[in-house]
Amino acid sequence: MWTLPLPDVVNVDSQLTTALTYINGDAVYALSSIERAAVLAVYQTYDTLLGQPGPSLIPNELAACRQHIREGYSQIQVGGRLASLRASLLASTDVCPYCGFGEPTELDHYLPKTQYDELAIYPRNLVPSCGPCNNAKRTVVPGMPGIPGLIHAYFQALPSVDFMRADVDFTDGALDVTFRIEAAELNPVLAAMLKFQL
């Protein structure tokens, strides 16, 4: 469980165009100038909200293009027009930020693309993760009632205190290790997220 440096987003406008354009140059979907501006505004709002959900991430101006942007995620897969984005995100770390030991082989949509189509190809919503963590998280959305969610690997500031503990027991000839979060020095919201993630 740790954080990653923010991915570069200087090319998000051209990545959006690439996702919505066939290799022969024909448009999968031709974004209007209003839609393009709205998508780029969603990206800025996402950064401002530190990756947390909010109604401003689903503007009405994007109703017609949402599905096309979500489907554009297929271009981030191996062999797709945005495969280099996938490769650079996966190359940014050797360890899954959710569990701290798995090899990142997948990209997790921190805010699920099923609910936040506009963010389906936004690099800062795509977190390199191992398969088991990505599968376990699936559509967990931060702020869901009763579910604290996971830390955001790009935006979460973690305190410089040791908060993870390992209790080691040797019982009946077997080693038993149990991990826990020591919450005493942590913000209660962060402590709940870390406990949920553990």
Segment roles from a protein language model:
Residues 104-186:
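Glycine- and acidic-residue-rich phosphate-binding/metal-coordinating active-site segment common to enzymes
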Residues 80-87, 114-119:
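Short, intrinsically disordered, charge-biased short linear motifs at domain edges
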Residues 191-198:
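An accessory alpha-helical subdomain
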Residues 26, 76, 92, 161-162:
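Short secondary-structure junctions and interdomain/linker hinges
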Residues 60-63, 91-96, 131-133, 143:
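Generic detector of short, locally flexible boundary/turn motifs and exposed helical patches
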Residues 85-106, 130:
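Short cysteine-rich loop/turn motifs with clustered Cys
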Residues 2-82:
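N-terminal accessory alpha/beta regions
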Residues 71, 77-80, 86, 92, ...:
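Mixed-charge, polar/low-complexity N-terminal
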